[in-house]
A protein has these predicted regions:
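Transmembrane-helix signature of 12-pass secondary carriers
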Residues: 2-465
Length: 465
């Protein structure tokens, strides 16, 4: 049953309604369904991180081959993000959000059944492509269904969901391990990702409609109003001003890449891309391999190392929630600066004192790393991208940032186990501490704050066809 009735006269009324409407249970439900992508992203990426020992043993993998398998998803995501962002602006948000999940389900099932490492590698590439296609569109959709005040906070909830997925993956592996799954442990774990993806796909097909902002730009007033009705469960009376419905004409950005780097958007694009890429480097090097780091800190007992992984990652949930709740008050940029500072400090302390101090102190520093990362750059890079561009450019902008950021993910995922095997934990941490230091310098220098800004009325800066 519809909760309220509104009257729409122009397309601008649609945007005004979205920007001014308080967050309701219906909006929260849509957010949870869309953020399901982030759960899948984190789960599918980290689940193999809990089973690197099994993969190495079953397939006789070298550290380099293991790195290739672990890097396959970020590599696939690089291309998926570019394509997903482009076609989300062209064909709509909902279609891409559905196609990507179907691809992810196929990839997860194939990966779980892989008889050889090369086949596993191929299906992980497909999974990465699907996640890459979905993620920027998910951030875009969240920004477009949230009111102006809550946009930054709602987009930043993704990091909370991410760490819930990471903790869940560790607990699921513990459960499956306790059930005696043996050598099939990693296969069952990966297959569960397909089950989760299927559930989210069904929820999206049932509850999700097209983004009202995209509809406003690409459909008639009547059609856009219908999408508004479906998303917010309201009744819309359409009383168009003269010529409003007939004035519809679909427009596209003439040269998206050039537009992203024009005088208006260049600093925004550089800032968002830099933060997203550098946070990917530091997280996928350290956070993704926490089960491996836990072996260094705690020992080789499977249950103990996984329990330690779950416990340490709770710091990520707390940090992500803190960052999301503080975004409106302090802005994305300031929280990013604070986060890079915390991450760099934690990595330097681990690098200097691992092996020379108490084990609990090193574990605390890893948790400190996750808290700073999830509340700062881990959260804010995606938010800055989603909030810095108007609807006509948002999909391409978030797609570009997400695509480039995957280079950072690939670097961290591929290089960490190799450096760790050759240099040990101390030198590896000190070397990788350069990443948050560079991020701190860039974020301090580029002074763009998107939180609370109205970017929808910037058509004069965008060349269209």
């Amino acid at each position: 049953m519809a909760s309220e009735t509104i009257t729409i006269h122009t397309k601008q009324d649609i945007i005004d309604y979205v920007n001014e409407r308080k967050t309701t249970k219906r909006t929260s439900l849509l957010l949870i369904i869309v953020l399901g992508t982030i759960f899948l992203d984190a789960y599918d990426l980290t689940i193999l991180g809990t089973a690197t020992d099994q993969l190495t043993q079953e397939f006789k993998l070298s550290p380099t081959y293991l790195s290739f398998i672990m890097t396959a998803m970020p590599f696939g995501a690089l291309f998926g993000a570019a394509i997903g962002g482009f076609y989300a602006d062209k064909l709509g948000r909902k279609l891409i959000l559905s196609v990507s999940l179907i691809s992810l389900i196929i990839g997860a099932i194939g990966a779980a059944l892989s008889p050889a490492p090369a086949i596993l590698l191929c299906f992980r590439l497909l999974m990465g492509f699907a996640i890459g296609m979905d993620s920027p569109v998910a951030f875009t959709f969240i920004a477009e269904i949230s009111n102006k005040k809550d946009k930054g906070r709602n987009v930043n909830y993704w990091q909370v969901v991410w760490y819930i997925a990471v903790v869940s993956s560790a607990l699921i592996v513990i459960l499956l391990y306790s059930l005696g799954t043996g050598a099939w442990l990693w296969r069952y774990s990966v297959a569960l990702g397909a089950v989760f993806a299927t559930i989210i796909l069904v929820l999206r097909l049932f509850y999700l409609s097209e983004s009202p902002s995209w509809s406003m730009k690409n459909k008639t007033l009547t059609e856009a109003s219908k999408e508004l009705e479906k998303n917010y469960n309201i009744n819309v009376n359409i009383e168009p001003n003269k010529g409003e419905d007939e004035s519809f004409s679909k427009t596209e950005v003439k040269n998206p890449l050039r537009t992203l780097f024009n005088k208006r958007y260049c600093k925004r694009t550089i800032l968002a891309t830099s933060i997203a890429t550098l946070q990917g480097m530091q997280y996928y090097a350290i956070g993704l391999y926490i089960p491996l780091i836990a072996i260094y800190i705690i020992g080789e007992n499977k249950i103990e190392s996984l329990s330690g992984t779950a416990l340490i990652n709770i710091a990520g949930i707390i940090g992500g929630l803190t960052g999301a709740l503080l975004t409106t008050k302090y802005g994305a940029r300031k929280l990013t600066i604070a986060g890079f500072s915390i991450v760099g400090t934690a990595m330097i302390i681990i690098g200097l004192f691992y092996g020379h101090t108490y084990t609990w102190l090193i574990a605390l520093m890893v948790a400190f790393f996750l808290f700073g990362h999830s509340g700062g750059p881990g959260t804010q890079g995606k938010a800055i991208a989603a909030l810095s561009y108007p609807t006509i450019l948002r999909g391409k902008g978030t797609g570009f940032v997400e695509s480039v950021s995957r280079f950072g993910s690939m670097f961290g995922t591929f290089i960490f186990p190799i450096i760790l095997a050759n240099l040990g934990l101390n030198k590896t941490m000190l070397l990788l501490a350069l990443v948050p230091i560079v991020g701190l310098i860039i974020t301090t220098y580029i002074k763009w704050e998107p939180v609370g800004k109205d970017v929808e009325h910037e058509d004069q800066y965008i060349e269209k066809v």
